[in-house]
Structures are given as structure tokens and as C-alpha cells.
Amino acid sequence: MAQLPASMRRKRAAITSIHDKPPTRKQKLANAGGWVLLVIAFVVLAVGIYGLYKVITDATVAKLEVVGSTSSVETQQVMQHVAPIIKANYFTSDLEQIRDKTLEISWVDRVVVSRAWPNGIRVRVMPRHAIARWGTGRLLSDGGDVFSEAEPTIHPELPLLHGPVSQSKMMMRRYNEINQLFHPANLRLKELYLTERMTWFMQFDSGLRIIVDQDQTMNKLQRLSHLAQSDLKPVWSKISAIDLRYRNGLSIQWKNATPPKIVNGQFVVTIDDTSIAGGTKAKP
């Protein structure tokens, strides 16, 4: 069997002797110091985690703060409504649950809930904006939602709408469309009613009353708006009420209960023996 050269055998023996050499005292101390530092780091980490756990679990119940409300009554109502579910602290409070609970309040449109250091929950509410009164004691928002105020207030400046709550959004659209139709005639809705049978009753700020059924409602109103600026313009101020529940016509009720005369196909109303339609004297 072949043997390695003497020089290679001596080199291999030297390498083996180096690896088999026991560690020095300095090396032992260095290794021990590393383990001590590792244990200390672990202890510090454990103490920190435990301390954080105690801070979270022992913190007092979060303090509720309400912003965005327009009155102290609204603020108090939000706090009373939400307070029963505020049982956790700053860290553990369920913000989504608080938001959903706040949205149950009728007059609240939107809600943003956030944490307020050091131990508060901030509830920012955005109240609904009313564009009309709805029935008795309620309001209609610009989003078409029927709601109640925190503190009921009379709003005589707002128009009155009344109908099935399920139709509130549709009624809001109709309200805006009708106002646009009759704007050229300087009319604006004061009251708008919708019955269960979908019949519309409306009264304008001039006192004019109109009734129309669900059959081609907007087409009939559009034709009337055109007549108000053309054929009916001379007598428009003399009309008390108009019934549009006819397929191809309408019924007019006059303020003085006496309809104006028709001369040459035109309405003629006499005021002090002077006609206002055609510029001629009215015939007796």
C-alpha cells in the first residue's frame, strides 16, 4: 500500500494537532459571556412584553369624545347611545362597532371613529342636512332619507312633503324636477303629497294647487308648464287649482269662481272693464 511522502505526513499531523488543541481560558470566557448576554436579552424582552400586556389590560375604560355635533343635545344623545358599548380601553375598543352604533341615530349621516391618545375614543359625527319637512315632526335630508332631529324644531321656511317613507328618495327627485319645470313661471313648491295610490297633490308658494295621477305624471306637468308660459299666461294669476287627471285635457278652478271669457280662442279676464288678454275692452 502506497504511503504519503514524509513532508505531507508531517503537515497533516500538524493540522490535526491544531484542531485537537483544547480552548484557552480566554475563549471559554468569551463563549460564556455570549450566553449570558443572550439570557439577559431574553429576560428584558419577556419583561417588556409582560409590561406592555399589563398596560393594555389594566388601562381604564376609554373616555368618549364627540365632535361635529351642532348642539349640546346632539352631543348628549350620541354619548348616551354609544356609552353602553364603551367597556374597553384605548387599545382594545372596537372602533367599527362604535361607528355602527352611532349610525343607528336617526339624524347622523356619517361617522368617523378614531383613537385619541392617551385614553380617548373620538367620535366625529356629520349631521344630515334637511331640505324639507316630512309629515309630522320629521325631516327629509338632501340624500332622500327621512329622519328625526335630536331636538325637534319647527322649520316653517322648509317645504312640506308627505308620503310613504319607502318613496322618500323618489319624492325628493320629483320635488326637484317639479321646481325646475315651473321655475320659468316663478313658482316654487310649498307642499307635495303622494298618496298610497300614487296620486300627487301639490301646492306652490303662490297658492296654486295641482293634482295629477301616476299616468305620465311628468309629461302632464311639463305640458302645463308650457301652457303657463303661453296660452294660460294671461290668466295664470287667476287660477286657483288645476286637475291633470285627464288623458288629453285638464280642469281649471278659478279664484273668483267665475271663469274668464274666451274671445277668438283666447282667455279674456276683465279688471275694471279692461281686458288683459288682447288689449281690448271685454264684451259684456
From Swiss-Prot:
Q: Is Amino-acid biosynthesis among the key words of this record?
A: no
Show the Gene3D superfamilies listed in the entry: Cell division protein FtsQ/DivIB, membrane protein fhac
Domain POTRA, residue spans: 59-128
Lineage: superkingdom: Bacteria
From the Swiss-Prot or TrEMBL record, state where the protein is found: Cell inner membrane
Question: What keywords appear on the UniProt entry?
Answer: Cell cycle, Cell division, Cell inner membrane, Cell membrane, Membrane, Transmembrane, Transmembrane helix
Task: Tell me the protein's name.
Answer: Cell division protein FtsQ
Q: Which organism is it from?
A: Acinetobacter oleivorans (strain JCM 16667 / KCTC 23045 / DR1)
| Keyword Cell inner membrane tagged | yes
Any ranges marked Cytoplasmic in the topology annotation, and which?
1-31
InterPro entries assigned to the protein according to its UniProt record, in alphabetical order? Cell_div_FtsQ/DivIB_C (IPR005548), FtsQ (IPR026579), FtsQ_C_sf (IPR045335), POTRA (IPR034746), POTRA_FtsQ_type (IPR013685)
- Note the subunit structure: Part of a complex composed of FtsB, FtsL and FtsQ.
Q: What does this protein do?
A: Essential cell division protein. May link together the upstream cell division proteins, which are predominantly cytoplasmic, with the downstream cell division proteins, which are predominantly periplasmic. May control correct divisome assembly.
Provide the Gene Ontology terms for cellular component.
Answer: cell division site; plasma membrane
Similarity section:
Belongs to the FtsQ/DivIB family. FtsQ subfamily.
Q: Where are the transmembrane segments?
A: 32-52
- Which biological process annotations from GO are given for this protein? cell septum assembly; FtsZ-dependent cytokinesis
Those parts of the protein on the Periplasmic side are 53-284
Look up and give the membrane topology term: Single-pass type II membrane protein
